[in-house]
């Protein structure tokens, strides 16, 4: 053991062996229980649907003011007894390594005590962050994260910027954080409110979401990560000779290797990194991602093993949909976390694409919920869409102005929960930094609250009562289409300051599924690494999204086991372009069974499909740059479905075989109409022929119209029944999937 960590280990052992706060009997026992296809909370032997209220960052946090009292009472009256609260342990981390008990009482215990006064039946999920405090960073500067874009900015606390923070590679930080977390858990379990804790949400890094500190600043070039990177290289390559051969650098050694700088990260002429020339970059990002995974594994296990009762443990992770700097954030090892015995649930907000958050939007969760369910975990959505009760919106969200708009949005959110057998918490934004606490529209609220209106709370109560009953019936998820996305692919994409990569990623990760929601079909989303685990016999169509890294072995499996049974198989952009060792356009042709060749287009590429034009829109603006590599289909044996605008070059084509059909889109496929046509011809059920959002499964069918769309709708149920609706613009209707009865309108 390293001497400098000896005192930490001794202190931890002392705390574990003879705590000053012996555990009080009667701690809550909680676990996930899978009932009739859904994951529910079993809390002290009673089942709860996974719906919570979460106000820790708002003006409503304190139950002792009127804002808090009213909102806690609202959710109590709506039948929601589960509440999330936050504790930032760096605020209670004393310089001598002990826990500041009065600060914990002030920031957490007294708040929970006040909530219990309002709702004696409340149980608590505690979100815990344990960032290093500033005094710790000053004491141990060699343990800090550094950024390739520039020096640490000691004047900012914005964790997306170059703020001072402990490196996730720091062994000292991890060991000393263990000590403070252990003291916190030991103390919490002695309190009256600690007996009501059923779950811990383990927060980490930027925004509690396990995105690496300063991920847009290209971390981590600091000493701690450099040490870890060298150890990682030693484990992988063993000898300097092997490293030199892999990196094509006769001068490098394991002992002198450093984290790549900005020039190395930024240098690239196209969308892809060449694994034969840029192995150093690929190696660092693998080390970076493994570091985050290691820290998560450590702390989730630590919480499980140091809480003397059964307790749920989860974290934010697995973000795909929306916008992300995938290499530098921290989710590329999500597939391995899904197998962790110490993680019960994963969480994330809704997709930030405006088609998800606009009026009439999809409310798409950011993660691949199909894989979460497949692995027996629970997915919890942070229901953070802004209602009309907050004066300003954020990102791409519509600024709602009426109860009716907000109710429609809440219904779409709820439909996602029911159809995916997931859960969520209602995130409170009133008084959140940057968000005005009161409405900007007349009449003003007397008290703050993102949901504090009779209409919204009535809707929330109705939804809760419905779901309390729905979970007693078998869960049915009759999706006909499966989408697969590959996190390993992102290692081979040159993301740093590269607009063309950004546009390809955005189209594949966002618009592909956004248009699928409006095609009228029900679909599931999975990790590509789960391809062999999924029961493919359920699906009429399989869509490979961002899956550009496919091994020879996987290609055989796809050709033998996916392309069969009359199934439609759709590939996008550059499927199998790399196997992890090289880039080869011939592999695209091999998997698509079409003649594919590179094409050079000197303007931002646009596809024309069914008379509509689709470019690579990102950040709310059209495609700005040419893309390289770009491909065309040069095959006389295909059916042409789309061309590049202003050219005869084929961009989308279909090839029918006796037992399956392949579609290849050389840019990520777009167009609800084209998808509807392809899915219908493959035998998938189409609920609605209008371009409305359709969410189906779990006993419901949801239809949501845009603000500029409405009118007569014919909804086709799977049992042959038809339901005629006259829908207003910007509204959401939820039907019973079997009877067609209107449940929410």
Give, region by region, the residue ranges found by the protein language model.
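Aromatic-lined substrate-binding rim segments of carbohydrate-active enzymes
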Residues: 65-154, 185-189, 299-307, 549
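A short, well-structured beta->alpha microelement
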Residues: 66, 334-335, 515-534
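A conserved amphipathic helix/loop scaffold
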Residues: 406, 545-745
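The substrate-binding groove and active-site-proximal loops of carbohydrate-active enzymes
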Residues: 49-63, 86-105, 159-179, 276-294, ...
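C-terminal motif of bacterial Sec signal peptides marking the signal peptidase cleavage site
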Residues: 16-17
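Hydrophobic targeting/anchoring helices
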Residues: 309, 314-511, 600-628, 639-643, ...
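N-terminal carbohydrate-binding accessory modules
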Residues: 20-75, 472-473
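Polysaccharide-binding and catalytic clefts of secreted carbohydrate-active enzymes
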Residues: 129, 137-339, 343-344, 349-352, ...
């Amino acid at each position: 053991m390293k001497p400098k960590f000896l005192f930490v280990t001794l202190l931890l052992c002392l705390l574990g062996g003879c705590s000053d706060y012996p555990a009080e009997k009667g701690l809550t026992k909680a676990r996930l229980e899978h009932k009739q296809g859904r994951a529910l909370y079993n809390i002290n032997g009673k089942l709860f649907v996974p719906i919570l209220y979460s106000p820790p960052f708002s003006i409503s946090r304190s139950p002792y003011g009127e804002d808090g009292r009213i909102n806690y009472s609202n959710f109590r009256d709506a039948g929601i007894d589960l509440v999330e609260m936050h504790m930032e342990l760096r605020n209670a981390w004393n310089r001598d390594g002990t826990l500041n008990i009065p600060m914990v009482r002030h920031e957490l215990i007294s708040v929970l005590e006040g909530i219990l006064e309002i709702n004696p039946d409340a149980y608590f999920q505690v979100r815990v962050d344990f960032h290093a405090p500033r005094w710790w960073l000053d004491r141990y500067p060699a343990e800090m994260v550094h950024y390739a874009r520039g020096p640490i900015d000691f004047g900012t606390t914005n964790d997306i910027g170059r703020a001072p923070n402990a490196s996730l590679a720091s062994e000292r930080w991890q060991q000393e954080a263990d000590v403070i977390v252990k003291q916190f858990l030991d103390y919490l379990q002695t309190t009256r409110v600690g007996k009501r804790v059923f779950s811990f949400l383990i927060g980490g890094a930027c925004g509690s979401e396990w995105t690496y500190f300063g991920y847009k600043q290209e971390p981590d070039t600091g000493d701690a990560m450099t040490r870890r990177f060298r150890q990682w290289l030693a484990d992988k390559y063993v000898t300097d000779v092997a490293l030199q051969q892999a990196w094509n650098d006769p001068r490098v050694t394991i002992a002198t290797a450093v984290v790549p700088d900005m020039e190395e990260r930024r240098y690239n002429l196209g969308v892809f990194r060449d694994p034969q020339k840029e192995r150093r970059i690929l190696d660092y990002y693998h080390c970076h991602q493994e570091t985050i995974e290691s820290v998560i594994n450590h702390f989730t296990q630590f919480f499980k093993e140091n809480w003397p009762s059964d307790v749920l443990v989860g974290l934010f992770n697995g973000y795909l949909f929306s916008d992300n700097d995938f290499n530098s954030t921290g989710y590329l090892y999500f597939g391995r976390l899904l197998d962790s015995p110490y993680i019960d649930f994963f969480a994330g907000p809704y997709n930030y694409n405006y088609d998800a958050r606009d009026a009439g939007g999809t409310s798409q969760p950011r993660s691949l919920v199909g894989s979460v369910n497949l692995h027996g975990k629970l997915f919890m959505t942070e229901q953070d869409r802004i209602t009309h009760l907050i004066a300003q919106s954020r990102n791409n969200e519509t600024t709602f102005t009426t109860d009716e708009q907000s109710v429609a949005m809440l219904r779409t959110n709820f439909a996602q929960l029911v159809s995916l057998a997931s859960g969520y918490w209602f995130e409170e934004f009133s008084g959140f930094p940057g968000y005005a606490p009161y409405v900007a529209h007349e009449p003003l609220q007397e008290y703050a609250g993102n949901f504090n209106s009779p209409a919204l709370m009535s809707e929330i109560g109705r939804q809760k009562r419905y779901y309390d009953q729905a979970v007693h019936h078998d869960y049915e998820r009759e999706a006909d289409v499966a989408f697969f996305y590959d996190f390993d692919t992102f290692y081979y994409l040159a993301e740093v300051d590269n607009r063309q990569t950004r546009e390809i990623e955005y189209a594949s990760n966002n618009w592909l599924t956004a248009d699928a929601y409006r095609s009228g079909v029900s679909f599931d989303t999975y990790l590509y690494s789960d391809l062999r685990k999924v029961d493919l016999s359920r699906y009429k169509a399989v869509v490979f999204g961002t899956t550009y890294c496919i091994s020879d072995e996987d290609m055989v499996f796809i050709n033998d086991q996916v392309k069969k049974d009359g199934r439609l198989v759709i590939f996008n952009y550059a499927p199998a372009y790399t196997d992890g060792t090289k880039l080869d356009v011939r592999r695209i042709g091999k998997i698509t069974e079409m003649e594919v060749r590179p094409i050079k287009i000197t303007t931002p590429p646009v596809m024309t499909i069914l008379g509509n034009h689709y470019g690579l829109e990102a950040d709310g603006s059209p495609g700005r740059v040419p893309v390289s590599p770009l491909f065309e289909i040069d095959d006389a044996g295909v059916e042409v479905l789309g061309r590049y605008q202003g050219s005869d070059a084929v961009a989308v084509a279909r090839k029918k075989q006796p037992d399956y059909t392949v579609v290849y889109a050389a840019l990520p496929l777009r167009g609800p109409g084209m998808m509807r046509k392809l899915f219908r011809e493959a035998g998938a059920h189409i609920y609605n022929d209008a371009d409305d959002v359709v969410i189906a499964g779990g006993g419901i069918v949801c239809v949501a119209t845009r603000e500029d769309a409405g009118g007569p709708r014919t909804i086709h149920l799977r049992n042959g029944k038809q339901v005629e609706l006259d829908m207003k613009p910007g509204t959401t209707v939820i039907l019973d999937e079997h009877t067609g009865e209107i449940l929410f309108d």
